[in-house]
Amino acid sequence: MKELLDRNLGSAWYLVGILMLAQTCSFIDRMIMGLMVGPIRQSFGISDTRFSLLAGLAFSLFYSLMGLPLARIADRGNRRKLIMICISLWSVMTALCGLARGFWTLFLARVGVGVGEAALSPAAYSMISDAFPKKALGLATSVYTMGVTFGSGLAYMLGGVVIGWASTVGTIELPGFGELEGWRLTFMIVGIPGLLIALMLSTVKEPARPAGEGLVAIPLRKVMQFITDRRRAMGCHIIGVAVLIMVVFGINIWGPTYLIRTFGFTPADAGMKFGTIMMVLGTAGLLAGGTIADAWFARGRNNAYPLVILISGLCMLPFVLGLGWVTEARLGLLCLAGATFFSA
């Protein structure tokens, strides 16, 4: 029995590893725009506000709208195939961002990225919850979510290097596409790995659902009744996490630009420093949060997971506020580091 359990957990951790790579890829494709504020604004002649619509609204609105219907498909269908299709979609749309010739074509490409990525987490969390015992879920989901910090960090580190290189060579002639600026080539390059990860998912087995689950479709009316009966708890949770995520993603998108505009960093230097913060402290925060929540839950604290989120948000607050007051680069980096650790 113990051998069977160990073998099952081995395949479960393999599943988490592949899903973490998918999450990493999704955040590279999602966050790479944070280093391209200047080049994109210059190419299209747009303001910071219109850039924010491209980086934020175009992605997040349709990411949110498509989350529920795609989650419904994940509940009733093959989650592995759903993720494979959606990874392919967002990867192609990321590459197409590099071919956009104006604000609206880039907006539509970002919408495609958001729609594709909307399926990943609902399906991934469902697969992980079926593959692991409850006492190990906190650590397993934290490892999966490490893709957020790895992806964001790699987006800034590699993006900074590419943009720094592109600034020295100007435009690049690509057969079939004509002259491309560095930021366009960056989008096309980062869109490729997702297609490879989609193929890797073909080696993963669909975890068995709990006995009886999925045999009879649950009517949407019952799902809505379940939510309505718990509207206070779910409403507070959704609103609270949404506000927290709004702050977190604001920092993630504008963090490098904050370093460039406030302290005079070059894009390459800002990307390397902010990317390192994301990878090291973001990953540490994720592992710490998951480990602490698992330990508290094992000791009988049923509210361990939302409690960790609450405490982390409160600890993050002074670092976020400090970003608007500090005047030295090292203090700015310290505030970004603290905010990143506790937000993870």
Each model region followed by its residue ranges:
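Cytoplasmic helix-loop-helix junction between adjacent transmembrane helices
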Residues: 109-148
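Extracytoplasmic gate region of multi-pass secondary transporters
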Residues: 33-34, 232-286, 343-344
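Juxtamembrane intracellular "pre-TM" segments in multi-pass secondary transporters
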Residues: 2-9, 206-237, 262
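Helix-loop-helix hairpin linking two adjacent transmembrane segments in secondary transporters
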Residues: 144, 148-202
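C-terminal transmembrane helical hairpin of 12-TM major facilitator-type secondary transporters
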Residues: 304-344
